[in-house]
């Protein structure tokens, strides 16, 4: 009842002016010849991306304001009878306010003059750690072609070349929020960046690292990056470009890996925009086609199939102003990606295990704003995100599998049974070593003339269909009342996933060699891990798809109060999350509250509004309008969670299963993976949260120089994970941690409806801490720009979402990872220490200079500390488990070791060949990693696997890119 009441109140508030996500604003004060405030002045704002101009009248205090302006170039004109007219040109930035003050002169001594307004480069009323970057900066710097490439410009955010997981900036790489035209393009339920809109479509970028207000529903546990796409303007403009990077333009890969290939890449872009109906309707359209090929591939296993990736993406946008006070934007993006020969990038993986992928992405947005009065504004946004993906091995096996023992594992052809992990000898295990010797001889790779274990051969293990959807609707109402800027907002969103996953043959196969037994004492020699959806029933059918859903609501109220030299921000965000799975139905007569109902959608858990109240408090003091001291306190409840799938009861019918075989390949037992099934929730869970404290100082030294410095502290707590119900007693949790089960009567629940011995629990004393001290400086000249930043930080704790498995550059379950998954993976098992995202020192410098010969030069430089890592070894926990897996079993404190520091310099030169006043041919050359610093990271840290301590990934070598653009 409480939830519905809050929702109704929020809806009422907004239906009765927010800084809409995709807009900026202009404000200022007009004075007369004597310096006194000048009321009644007509101020008009004309923009190249705003079809119709807007007007405002200055108040009794001479103040004026334009809200909800699309970012772009504007001209302000000021007129009052008896005084000379004035006009000023300026650029409105995304989520930024531009302040323009004007002093008007008597008409008899003044003539209209248009000048470029000197805009303050810092917002002395804001406590946010934020920055805006427009297309002029992006185009003149050595920045890549994808949305992800822009992240490297953010101060204090680690430079990363990982392709899936986001970089860290005081939180998990899965807690960042990525917005494009206000659309959350993060992968539903996982929080990684799933969409890669072309940077050519981006007009401006805005980044908020901390100190967020209760505006735009910011729940990010990391950073939030938003961008606004290009729009049509009052002139027809277009561009055709082609960019290339051949293998010959790429330096030799100076790595420790024996994986070799020749990679060619190119990017094609076409865009065009302009007015459809003058002063009413503008359009913009683009086509983007990046391709990547890897030829002549080889590794320790020999030749590897060539791989290819091709993407075709179209984008269209309309900007409509039916009246001077109404602005409507609509856009649609459609992308199709086809990839073949993937997944074989490691040196020790046979090319026969390659996989092909296909993905489609569709994004629809509709947003609008209405300037109801000079002091009140209403805005709305609707977004629809659809990402359909599929993946299947390039080599498919054609035999069915069963769990009744009628289908054997063909031990004489293990490379035709699934993905086979070749074992390695273990010191002192003579019987085991003798058993695996012929397997290494047949399936191992040859190194120095000797067959060697530790590699992977066979075929790809899994066939997957994975579709993601997100719908979101939000409303916002802003009102200026004296010294108060009031904001009210409501958001409703739904994240969905549909998953069908089957195994190719027996899936993934490992060798236990008789070191473990089934309950009756029979030795296990082989273990296969396969998907239950692969198993046929007596009718020859398999389980249907798993549907998972997360529904969220948020209400926000914010008041920005200006009192003399002080600005206070008081805000609150209240959120409600509902997690839905499949396979159960509510039944109050049962102790568990549920009954089995295959295919039925049920609410597995709810976090109510009163459990996720997020205060946003801040204060700034600016004694002179150019210096500002600020402080803020905020709490964030990150929205991303994988539990709607990971804990769904449907996983009991569609879970991962371990099959155990004897030396001849006879199935002697099966054991559903306990963490891969439906789970109950511990009672009284507190949602995970991030508390943040900031103090800072900013100063506009002069019209060109700005300086910012801050200190920030973040504390993460109340982390949820799936874990053994009896983990605390079974794996000897230290005092003062309780030895009790998380759910004392779990066995009674399971007697009714089954389920896992694992539960979703709030892990005892789980935490992260992040300390940061940073300084930034900006310099803007008439033909140049420079930005420098240095950040010291320390990120540590005992819960590392970024370091839970072997391949962390992936969509890892949030709330159901390897953390706390059985023996050796509990938080008291060496997990306290430096986290994977810790980068103690980071320096970034970038800028550009425009020459007087139609050329420009840009540069980007970064230095950062290395990546923490530690050894993993199951033998440390041998008395607790018979497993052979080192994965996520820390043999020493987290982050005990660190890779080498990384630094690199990227360069750009651009030259324009102007043809008349309308056309331009632009040639641009980029050099990335000019010093060819190929630092290794992503260490192979499994003690019992080949090449312990060696780097599995390296920063890309020196590479050149050449682009030609025809602009008109």
How should each PLM-predicted stretch be described?
Residues 59, 82-84, 88-105, 110-231, ...:
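Periplasmic N-terminal accessory/gating domains of Gram-negative outer-membrane beta-barrel systems
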Residues 117, 240-246, 285-289, 330-334, ...:
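Transmembrane beta-barrel strands of outer-membrane/channel proteins
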Residues 406, 433, 442-453, 583-614, ...:
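Solvent-exposed loop/turn elements at secondary-structure boundaries
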Residues 48-63:
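Short, acidic Ser/Thr/Gly-rich low-complexity loop/linker segments typical of extracellular
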Residues 577, 704, 708-870:
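Gram-negative outer-membrane beta-barrel transporters
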Residues 704, 854-885, 899-906, 910-968:
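C-terminal beta-signal and adjacent terminal beta-strands/loops
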Residues 237, 260-338, 355-384, 573, ...:
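Transmembrane beta-barrel wall of Gram-negative outer-membrane proteins
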């Amino acid at each position: 009842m409480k939830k519905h009441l809050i929702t109704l109140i929020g809806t009422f508030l907004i239906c009765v002016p927010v800084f809409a996500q995709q807009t900026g604003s202009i404000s200022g004060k007009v004075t007369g010849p004597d310096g006194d405030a000048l009321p009644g002045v007509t101020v008009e704002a004309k923009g190249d991306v705003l079809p119709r101009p807007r007007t405002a009248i200055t108040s009794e205090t001479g103040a004026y304001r334009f809200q909800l302006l699309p970012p772009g170039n504007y001209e302000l004109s000021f007129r009052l009878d008896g005084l000379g007219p004035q006009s000023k040109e300026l650029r409105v930035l995304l989520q930024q306010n531009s302040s323009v003050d004007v002093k008007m002169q008597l008409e008899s001594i003044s003539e209209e003059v248009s000048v470029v307004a000197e805009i303050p480069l810092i917002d002395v009323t804001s406590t946010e750690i934020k920055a805006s970057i427009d297309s002029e900066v992006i185009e003149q710097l050595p920045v890549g072609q994808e949305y992800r490439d822009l992240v490297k410009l953010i101060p204090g955010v680690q430079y990363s070349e990982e392709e899936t997981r986001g970089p860290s900036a005081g939180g998990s790489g899965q807690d960042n929020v990525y917005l494009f035209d206000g659309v959350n393009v993060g992968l539903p339920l996982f929080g990684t960046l799933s969409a890669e809109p072309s940077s050519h479509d981006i007009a401006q970028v805005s980044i908020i690292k901390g100190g967020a207000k209760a505006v735009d529903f910011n729940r990010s546990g990391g950073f939030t990056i938003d961008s606004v796409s290009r729009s049509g303007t009052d002139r027809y403009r277009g561009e055709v470009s082609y960019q290339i990077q051949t293998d010959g333009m790429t330096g030799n890969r100076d790595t420790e890996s024996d994986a070799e290939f020749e990679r060619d890449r190119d990017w094609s872009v076409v865009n065009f925009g302009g007015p459809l109906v003058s002063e009413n309707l503008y359009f913009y359209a683009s086509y983007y086609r990046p391709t990547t090929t890897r030829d002549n591939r080889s590794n320790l296993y020999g030749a590897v199939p060539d791989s290819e990736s091709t993407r075709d993406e179209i984008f269209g946008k309309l900007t409509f102003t039916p009246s001077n006070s109404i602005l409507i934007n609509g856009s649609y993006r459609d992308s199709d990606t086809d990839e073949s020969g993937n997944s074989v990038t490691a040196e020790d993986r046979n090319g026969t295990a390659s996989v092909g992928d296909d993905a489609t992405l569709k994004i629809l947005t509709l947003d609008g704003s209405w300037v109801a009065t000079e002091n009140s504004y209403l805005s709305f946004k609707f977004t629809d995100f659809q990402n359909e993906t599929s993946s299947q091995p390039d080599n498919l096996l054609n035999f069915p599998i069963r769990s009744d023992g009628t289908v054997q594992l063909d031990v004489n052809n293990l490379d035709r049974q699934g993905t086979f992990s070749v074992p390695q000898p273990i010191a002192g295990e003579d019987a085991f070593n003798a058993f695996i010797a012929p397997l290494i001889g047949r399936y191992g790779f040859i190194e120095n003339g000797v067959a060697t274990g530790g590699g992977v051969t066979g075929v790809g293990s899994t066939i997957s269909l994975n579709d993601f959807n997100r719908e979101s609707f939000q409303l916002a109402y802003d009102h200026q009342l004296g010294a108060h800027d009031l904001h009210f907002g409501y958001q409703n969103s739904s994240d969905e996933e549909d998953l069908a996953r089957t195994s190719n043959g027996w899936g993934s196969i490992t060798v236990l060699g008789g070191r473990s037994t089934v309950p009756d004492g029979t030795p296990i020699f082989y273990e296969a891990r396969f998907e239950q959806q692969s198993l046929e029933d007596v009718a020859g059918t398999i389980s249907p798809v798993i549907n998972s859903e997360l529904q969220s609501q948020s209400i926000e109220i914010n008041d920005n109060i200006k009192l003399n030299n002080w600005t206070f921000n008081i805000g609150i965000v209240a959120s409600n999350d509902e997690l839905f799975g499949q396979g159960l139905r509510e039944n109050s007569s049962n102790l568990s509250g549920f009954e089995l109902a295959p295919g039925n959608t049920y609410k597995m858990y709810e976090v109510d509004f009163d459990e996720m109240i997020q205060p946003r408090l801040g204060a700034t003091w600016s004694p002179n309008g150019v210096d500002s001291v600020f402080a803020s306190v905020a709490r964030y409840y990150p929205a991303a969670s994988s539990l709607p799938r990971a804990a769904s009861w449907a996983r009991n019918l569609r879970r991962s299963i371990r099959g155990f075989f004897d030396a001849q390949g006879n199935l002697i037992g099966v054991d559903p993976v306990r963490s891969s099934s439906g789970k109950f929730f511990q009672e009284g869970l507190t949602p995970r949260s991030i508390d943040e404290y900031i103090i800072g100082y900013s100063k506009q030294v002069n019209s060109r120089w700005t300086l910012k410095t801050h200190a920030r502290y973040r504390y993460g707590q109340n982390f949820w994970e799936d874990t053994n119900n009896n983990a605390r007693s079974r794996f000897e949790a230290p005092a003062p941690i309780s030895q009790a089960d998380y759910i004392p009567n779990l066995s009674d629940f399971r007697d009714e409806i089954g389920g896992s011995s694992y539960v979703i629990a709030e892990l005892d004393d789980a935490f992260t801490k992040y300390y940061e001290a940073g300084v930034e400086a900006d310099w803007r000249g008439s033909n140049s720009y420079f930005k420098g930043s240095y950040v010291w930080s320390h990120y540590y704790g005992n819960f590392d979402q970024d370091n839970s498995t072997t391949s962390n550059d992936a969509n890892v379950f949030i709330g159901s990872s390897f953390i706390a998954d059985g023996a050796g993976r509990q938080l008291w098992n060496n997990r306290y220490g430096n986290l994977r995202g810790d980068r103690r020192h980071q320096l970034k410098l970038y800028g550009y200079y425009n020459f007087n010969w139609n050329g420009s030069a840009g540069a980007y430089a970064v230095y950062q500390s290395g990546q923490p890592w530690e050894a993993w070894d199951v033998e440390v926990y041998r008395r607790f488990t018979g497993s052979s897996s080192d994965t996520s079993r820390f043999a020493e404190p987290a982050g005990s070791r660190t890779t080498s520091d990384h630094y690199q310099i990227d360069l750009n030169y651009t030259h324009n060949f102007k043809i008349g006043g309308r056309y331009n041919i632009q040639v641009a050359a980029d050099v990335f990693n000019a010093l060819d610093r190929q630092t290794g990271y992503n260490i192979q840290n499994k003690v019992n696997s080949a090449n312990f301590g060696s780097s599995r990934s390296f920063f890309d070598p020196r590479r050149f890119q050449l682009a030609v653009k025809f602009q008109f």
